Structures are given as structure tokens and as C-alpha cells.
Amino acid sequence: MSLSHLSLKYFRNIEALTLEPVNGVNIIYGENGSGKTSLLEAIYYLSHGKSFRTSKHKSIIAHQQEQFVIHGRKAIHDLSIPIGISKTQAGETNLKIQGKASRKISELAQLMPVQIITPESYSLFFGGPKERRKFLDLGLFHVEHEFFFLWQSFNKVLKQRNALLKSKPKNYFDQIKFWDKEFVRLAEQINKLRMAYISRFKQQFFDKMCAELTLIRDLEISFNAGWKESESLSDALELNFERDARQGFTSKGPHKADFSFSVAGSSVENIFSRGQLKLLLYALKVTQNSLIESETDKQSILLIDDLPSELSEDTKEKVGQLLAHCSSQIFISSILSESISAVVEPMQRELQMFHVKHGNLITR
């Protein structure tokens, strides 16, 4: 159930390139600026419909070209499903799945679960709650099909409530009371799914990762729903109504949810070393992919950009031991192919090396 084929056209510095990856581990190496990260970016784009590097699509389209095109084939059991996405300078996006046009990025995302680890991924610890909600909700999107539609519906209600809080039309208090019923109904369903998912995530995380990482044995993963556990959401909305009206936005609800990592009451970002945080990050990502695969029967993809960056040899070996628990198809970018041998050896999986130079690919 892997990505068995990838072809790019006019994607950054890549004029035209075709890749036939293996189901196991794919190492993409080359000098900085060679195009290796662009390959990971293209795979990510094929699943998410956006880049992890920029929000400006024009910077992705090759110089003096009208559009970029990405094609792939996703092997699912005995089927080979063609998928594709293109984007023009004008911002028009075209999607195709099995030769048929689609308007929903979510259909591509469901077909090909993709997670990425980059040097910026440590925002999971140091960034705001939004980064952690994104991580949590990515897993929910794949394992709970109703979550996506609940979240879309909730955001429409949230937008309506916030608009009323800002504009304050006549009788807006009564209007907000009307919307609050739907707000609470959707919010409680979202919260129920999140709590159940975190419970399953924690069980798999500690069952699989404790043997590899002694540092997580005393780790606590705590979830905050976005309102106090001791009060109902209806009460929270009522108690905070005056403040929300002054500020013009809703301060309580699942859009404010967060979860945290701590040991003996202290946040991990304050007590773990940089190397320990890196290992924790890999353990969390591997667990998420494993949970998606076990609950959906889909093989996910893990992209790792610039893996050896700042990693000691001991840390590389531990990363390899963590990745050995991962049955995902893996793509790793690196400057030097030799520098990641300590990571690859413990994994004992099919391996393919790709050398990228000036946007061109050489299979080794």
C-alpha cells in the first residue's frame, strides 16, 4: 500500500523527474539546493494539497513556467491508483484520482496518510496549542471519518458566533443563545472523539516506546478540552460571555484545546535536552503512524527532512531503533548517504538510495 511511483514537472528546480520508490526506506541525498527536500515537499503536497515550506504557491512553480504537476501511484493491495495535483500561477488547483477530477483535497489525504519531521517540527513542544491540535487532529482525520465533517460544521458555527460577538446586532444575545446549542452539541462530539483517540494513542505509545526510550517511562500526556473539566461547556460559554463580547471572539471550546507533555509536573521542553526532545518527537510520530495503520488498514508515509542534522551517533542509533517499530513507507533526505547508516541499520527493511544533483535524479 505504498507510493510506488512519483513524477514531477516544473516543481521548484526540478524540470522533470520520475521516482520509483521502494515500500521500505528511501534515502534521498545530495548537496544543499540539489532538490532533495523538494522531493519530500512534492510527496507532502500530493497528500495535503499544500507545502510544508511555504504558503506562496508561485515560489514552487519553476521559473518562467505556468504550472507545476505532480503525479503518483498509490499501491493498495492489488490495485495501483493514479493520483495527481497541479497548480497554476493564477492559483488554480486541479486534482485527479483514478483519472477523475476531484475538488476535495481531503480525498487525496484519506488515500495517502503522510506525516513529516523537519527541523521545525519541534514546534510541537515549543509552539502554541495550534501546533499540538494539528498533530492530534491529523490522526483523528484518518481514523474517525466523522471527525472531519464534525470539525467543518463546528467551525461554521464558531465563525457565526464570533461574527455576532464582533458586530453585536440587535438582540444578538438571543441569537448567540440559539447558536450555542449547536456549538455545544458539535463541541462535545469532537471532544469525545479526541479523548478516546488520546487514550488509544497513549496506550500504544507507552506499550511500544517504553522499551526503547527509558526517558518516557515517567512521562505524562495531559489533555485540556478547551474548557474546565469541572464545568460544562454550556456553563463556560455563559460565564465567559461578557469577556467574549468585549474581545469579539469565543474563548472556550474545542478550538482552544491543547495537550502537554510533562515529567513530575515539569514541561518536557524545560527539562529535556535537545537530543531527548528529538527522540520524543520521533516516538510520537511513529506512534501516530502506527495507530493510523492499525485502525485503517492503510500504510502511511513518513517523510524525514535533513535527518542527521545535529544528531549524535548514539541518538541516530536510537532513532533507528524507534523507526524499526514503524511499518510506514519512509523517505529520508540527507546531505551525505553515509551519515545515516546508524539510523538505517536497526530498521532491517528494504532500502533504496537516490542521489539528487541540480534537480536531476541518479538511482544507486
Swiss-Prot record:
The RecF protein is involved in DNA metabolism; it is required for DNA replication and normal SOS inducibility. RecF binds preferentially to single-stranded, linear DNA. It also seems to bind ATP. Belongs to the RecF family. It is found in: Cytoplasm. One of its GO terms (cellular component) is cytoplasm. ATP binds at residues 30-37. Coiled coil: none annotated. Signal peptide: none annotated. It comes from the Bacteria. InterPro entries: DNA-binding_RecF, DNA-binding_RecF_CS, P-loop_NTPase, RecF/RecN/SMC_N, RecF_2. SUPFAM superfamilies: P-loop containing nucleoside triphosphate hydrolases. This is DNA replication and repair protein RecF. GO terms for biological process: DNA replication; DNA synthesis involved in DNA repair; double-strand break repair; SOS response. NCBIfam families: recf (TIGR00611). Keywords: ATP-binding, Cytoplasm, DNA damage, DNA repair, DNA replication, DNA-binding, Nucleotide-binding, SOS response.
